[in-house]
């Protein structure tokens, strides 16, 4: 079982799989970042084990970051979902999302709520070791919808800076290396 870890700042963090995390901030806000759950091929995390989601942040829309989003919204219909502006329409179509809780995000935008602030930062998908980039949009299955959503996942990517109600800051920074 994947346990929630508590840090001295009061933040609770649980790795879900791949790039996915569940985070509980000191003020109580529950965030999911790139949650790939039951569908994951390695170490799936059951959606049924998630008790709450107030905010869902997608760095990009490759399936290993976004495939669970439709099921998450069905379980937590009030959750605010943040996704790149170019990817939003295809994401809604692919996973039949309620657009009222979807935030189309561009780099530099800031979203302020009572319990946190979310800032979007431009990012770039990293290459794997050896220089291979396995997630290119044109390498995806021939399903037109999937091809489009994967293409946008390769086209735009976001990092996020979260400021909790107590002033604690967290940076969501994607990539396979710290270089």
Regions found by a protein language model. Give the residues of each.
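Beta-strand-turn-beta hairpins that frame and shape the catalytic cleft
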Residues: 5-12, 25-31, 110-119, 163-170
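Pre-active-site segment of Zn-dependent metallo-hydrolases
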Residues: 3, 22-62, 67-75, 128-146, ...
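Short hydrophobic/aromatic beta-strand or adjacent loop that forms the aromatic wall/cage
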Residues: 18-20, 108, 155-159
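Short, hydrophobic beta-strand segments that form beta-sheet elements in well-ordered domains
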Residues: 12-15, 30-34, 80-84, 101, ...
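Metallo-beta-lactamase
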Residues: 147-179
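A short, compositionally biased domain-edge/stem linker segment
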Residues: 1-6, 19
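A short catalytic or substrate-binding loop motif that flags glycine-/basic-rich loops and adjacent residues
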Residues: 13-17, 151-154
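Active-site HxH/HxHxD metal-binding segment of metal-dependent hydrolases
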Residues: 45-111, 116-131
């Amino acid at each position: 079982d994947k346990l929630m870890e508590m840090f001295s700042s009061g933040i609770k963090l649980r790795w879900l799989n791949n790039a996915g995390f569940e985070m509980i901030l000191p003020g109580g806000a529950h965030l999911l970042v790139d949650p790939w759950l039951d569908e994951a091929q390695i170490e799936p995390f059951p959606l049924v084990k998630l008790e709450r989601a107030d905010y869902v942040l997608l760095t990009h829309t490759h399936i290993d970051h976004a495939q669970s989003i439709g099921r998450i919204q069905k379980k937590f219909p009030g959750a605010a979902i943040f996704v790149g502006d170019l990817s939003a329409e295809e994401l809604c179509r692919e996973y039949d999302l309620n657009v009222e809780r979807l935030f189309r995000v561009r780099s530099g935008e800031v979203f302020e709520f009572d319990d946190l602030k979310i800032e979007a930062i431009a990012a770039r998908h990293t290459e794997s070791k050896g220089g291979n980039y396995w997630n290119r949009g044109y390498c995806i299955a021939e399903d037109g919808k999937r091809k489009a959503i994967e293409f946008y996942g390769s086209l735009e990517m976001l990092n996020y800076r979260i400021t909790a109600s107590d002033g604690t800051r967290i940076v969501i920074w994607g990539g396979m290396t710290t270089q």
